[in-house]
Amino acid sequence: MNIYFMGMILSMIVYIVLGLVISRQVKDVNDFFVAGRQAPTFLIVGSLVASYCSTGLFMGDVGEAYAGFYTPFMITAMMLVGGYVIGSVFFGKYLRRSEALTIPEFFGNRFNSRPLRILAAVTAIITMTVYLLSVMQGIGTLMNYVTGVNYNICILLALITFAVLTVTSGSKGVLITDTLMFSIFTGASLIGVVIIVGKLGGWTTAVTNVTKLNPTIFSWSGDLSHLYPTGTENIIWAVMTGLTWVAVCAVGPWQSSRYLMAKNEHTVVRSAVWATIGVTLLEFFLPTVGALLNVYSDQIPSASLSMIWATMNLLPKVLGVIVLTGVLAAGISSATTFLSLIGSSVANDIMVIDDDKKKLRYGRVSIIVVCVVVMILAYFNPPQIYIIMLGVCETPQAA
């Protein structure tokens, strides 16, 4: 058992204990599904950024930049952050005003249509389950590489953590732990960026060295062997993907559902502005460092593990443990958000239940069922983190 595994296990125990403690404050469906609608700006920002990042940022996005697709990817990333403000102003504040428990309920009431409400719920459940699979595989890949522990054991440990956290404390626990996780991985990651760039000789030297090694790493077209054979096609892909992600960040259920928990409409808009700043910082600095890590290409095992390798080999041991624990936390954060949404959609939108206690019970049972399904899929499916994440979000349903 190495120090990284010990750090990850300790963090999982902390999250489980927090979930059990917070569960004492969960009295009804309002607490379980929308955290009592009393969340301040800091908690909403923490949950927005934490549920966005997951392992997809640290392994998928950074991996794409490392693989030579930096400029097209950066176009997409800098476009998508605008979705937060757009979504909060034109959708989020009205969502909060509706006082619905779920987004499908909002649409069902808005258009006075029970079938539409069910369709929205089914769509959310399917997309969130697939995205959850992506996160689960990312966590398993991370833990397996860092600790050497069997991949299946890793995903089982992760599943137990976010299942217990979500089932016991619901959205209230998810909000608080999301914010804790956000603080850990954002702070540690940005400090890590400074140290890694320093070891590369500073920004100017690092860029000079990596472009000597790979002259096309920062080219406008990206690596023409990575996706499409022409720069024009790659840029078109980047813009179209960026527009898709604008919609996802604006109205995607795993993002906009946070607004249902906000204290008021002002909190919704303020949170979106701060989330835009947070995601911009992370999406710029981490993939940029990922591209610079090409100077170690002979030592890095794969693109998706580039930042993980740098954390283990270029950072001080203690900071490395904190960063990797933060990456794990980001994955767990996204997973708890998805599970919370799935549970609320099943109990509140698909099933017709008037009794609050039964609604809570069915919501928790549905979370457990989805966990088992995702565990089975993750066991038989090879990890394809970025492909699954991208596939989910490039469907009309995800937006």
Language-model segment annotations:
Residues 17-25, 128-136, 142-157, 161-162, ...:
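Hydrophobic alpha-helical segments and their helix-loop junctions in multi-pass secondary transporters
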Residues 31, 99-108, 170-180, 251-284, ...:
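Hydrophobic, small-residue-rich membrane helices and short re-entrant helix-turn-helix hairpins
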Residues 33-100, 236-248, 255-299, 308-330:
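Membrane-interface helix-loop-helix modules in multi-pass membrane proteins
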Residues 110-118, 125-129, 344-382, 393:
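Loop-to-transmembrane helix boundary motifs in multi-pass membrane proteins
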Residues 39-42, 72-74, 111-118, 147-157, ...:
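Membrane-interfacial loop-to-helix junctions in multi-pass transporters
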Residues 50, 74-168, 236, 240-248, ...:
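Helix-loop-helix module between adjacent transmembrane segments
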Residues 20, 54-64, 71, 128-142, ...:
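Transmembrane helix-loop junctions in multi-pass membrane proteins
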Residues 121-134, 165, 183-197, 236-250, ...:
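Selective recognition of specific alpha-helical transmembrane segments in multi-pass small-molecule
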